Regions:
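A short, basic-hydrophobic beta/loop patch
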Residues: 113
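Conserved helix-loop functional segments at active or binding sites
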Residues: 149, 153
Length: 304
């Protein structure tokens, strides 16, 4: 108990800060807990937080749910999609919010205060804490229910993937009319919409939901991502450089979770590379391929 109390009161001693580049070129601060605090947070996540149900509209960070795929499937049959983004999502959830969450779960004020301290840093949810995504989902329960109630009356599909809010309808006018009301609810729940990231999609242009492309009511992973994967595979095989093997496997698994059979496609692609004469003539390439197979079930490359 004394150790937990110390962890909760001296958070600044148990976090490491890193700068992570964002797509727009700016930097994001990532506060990651050191191992001792991370172990405690993992226990809180599994033994406390994940035993509380999130709203049915929360798609991300839910155990047993393929959130990205399920999210896209819910919107794929609609003609128009409105995507909105919550600004500074984790940073908008305060230590007080987390304290009240634990009291609602059933803990007394003292325990709730300790748990809130263990799960926050500098007064808000930290980007790098394992507990932050699920806490954010629980905090957003009221937001999800209010937005869904508004949308259900208008035959609009609503989902939330972390800080990405998705709304779809067969009627563009309904989405236009509801946008202001959506922002008011989001603001009333303590968040702000990042207007720069608000986007409309329709059937006359490529539709995307949380990064997944929808064409002809079918969902696909981003084409540029798949091109990048093939490029990485070719580089690994032809240059005998498997330093990014783990990343390649992870990217393939991600796309395969969206598009059934993608792993098999990439296995066939690698088997095709293994048959290329110009590659089989290099002892270095052959040896590296056979020693670093991206998939265990691939046949050996036969040297010439």
């Amino acid at each position: 108990k004394t150790y937990l109390y110390m962890l909760s009161r001296k958070q600044h001693l148990f976090y490491e800060t890193a700068q992570i580049p964002k797509k727009d070129g700016s930097m994001r601060k990532l506060h990651a807990p050191v191992r001792s605090l991370k172990v405690v947070q993992k226990w809180i996540l599994v033994e406390i937080l994940e035993k509380v149900k999130v709203s049915p509209y929360a798609m991300a960070f839910v155990p047993g749910k393929n959130g990205l795929k399920e999210n896209a499937l819910l919107h794929k049959d609609r003609v128009f999609i409105l995507e909105m983004d919550i600004h500074d999502f984790f940073g908008s959830i305060t230590q007080r919010d987390v304290f009240h969450l634990f009291t609602k779960i059933g803990y007394n004020y003292t325990i709730s205060a300790i748990l809130a301290n263990l799960c926050t840093y500098e007064g808000v949810l930290p980007q790098g804490a394992v507990t932050s995504p699920y806490i954010a989902n629980l905090i957003c329960y009221n937001l999800d229910m209010r937005l869904s109630a508004l949308c259900n009356k208008r035959d609009i599909v609503y989902t939330r993937y972390a800080d990405d809010l998705s709304f779809s309808s067969d009627n563009r006018t309904r989405l236009n009319r509801i946008e202001r009301l959506l922002k008011e609810i989001v603001r009333d729940e303590g968040f702000e919409i990042n207007d720069k990231k608000t986007r409309y999609f329709s059937n006359d242009r490529k539709k995307t939901v949380t990064g997944i492309t929808i064409n002809d009511r079918e969902i696909h992973a981003d084409r540029k991502l798949k091109q990048r994967i093939r490029s990485k595979i070719f580089h690994a095989v032809s240059e005998a450089d498997y330093s990014e093997a783990a990343q390649i496997r992870g990217l393939i698994a991600f796309v395969d979770s969206i598009e059934d059979g993608y792993r098999d496609q990439m296995a066939c692609y690698m088997e095709g590379l293994a048959l290329k004469k110009e590659l089989r003539r290099s002892a270095k390439v052959v040896r590296a391929y056979n020693e670093n197979k991206l998939f265990r079930d691939l046949e050996d490359m036969i040297p010439l």
